[in-house]
Every structure is written in structure tokens, then in C-alpha cells.
């Protein structure tokens, strides 16, 4: 998976993207050389390739699924921080997966000293992310996950003048020059 670029000739093993995280979680292979952390959750090349081939929701599902099966609260916190960073940058990452390294570094740099897996991931972003995007932040410069901002609803070309939450709290409908329905449950 080295030197992955966004060309139409790129081909991805979609079965591997779906099955590997699922199977590693089910057999409890979180740590070690062949584990979930090193090969999937905190692996820049894996995340970038999966984001290039699959929708963001598929990537987030891997994080949510692993959190459900984890007992270690420190590992759960690290996985949640990365997932929330991806969620916060979702509007950009859905269209431009090349922004993965800047998004992760800009949001998680302040967390790297206390979280070894995040530190490893950001090191990979710093070294390998330059292949996709030369604009890598050197300082923490974006909203940190875990704060009051949970979602960023970006998609309107003009100012939003109204929005409503559905009674079941699952969707937000926003109005500008067009209506957009946002699924906030996922």
C-alpha cells in the first residue's frame, strides 16, 4: 500500500478493507505486529487507502466496532480521539482524502504526548502524508476532538438561514439556497 495516489487506475481490495478490521476485532488481535492497532487503526497508509476507496462511514464503523469490543479505557480513548477527528474533518475528507494527514495532525497534535498510538500515527502522517499533501501543520491548529464541537455541517455554498432537528434526534435539515438533510445518528 505504499505511494498510493488518487488516480483512476488505482484498484483497492475492498474485501480486505471490510474483513480485516472485523476479523481482527472478533479474534481479539488488538496488539502486536499483526494486530488491529498497528495495521489498521493507527496506520496512516491503511487509513488513507480506505478513505480513498470507501466512504468515511465505513472507516468510522471500524473505530466504533473496535470500541465496542475493547475493555482497556486508554486504548478506547485513543481510538475515540482518532474517530472523532475523522468525524470533525468529515466534510473535507469525504471529498479530499489527501487531507487526511493535515486533518489528523491539526486536530491531534496536542494529544500525542500522552497517547503512544496517536504519536505513532502522527509520525506516519508527518513522514508519509507528504506524498499526498505538502501542507502539513507544525502546530495544533484545529478543533480538538472531545470538546463541545461534535460535528461540522459543511455543504452549503451560502449562509444557512434555518435548520431543524427531527423529533427522533436522528436528522438535521438545513436550509440555504437548497435543503440538506444530515444524518447525525451515524
Where in the sequence are the language-model features?
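Residue-level detector of Asp-centered blade-edge/turn motifs that repeat once per structural unit
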Residues: 167-168
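Conserved strand-to-loop turn within each blade of WD40 beta-propeller repeats
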Residues: 175-177
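WD40-repeat beta-propellers
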Residues: 163, 179-185
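WD40/WD-repeat beta-propeller blade N-cap
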Residues: 153-160
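Eukaryotic short linear interaction motifs
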Residues: 113, 159, 180-181
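Hydrophobic repeat-domain scaffold segments
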Residues: 1-148
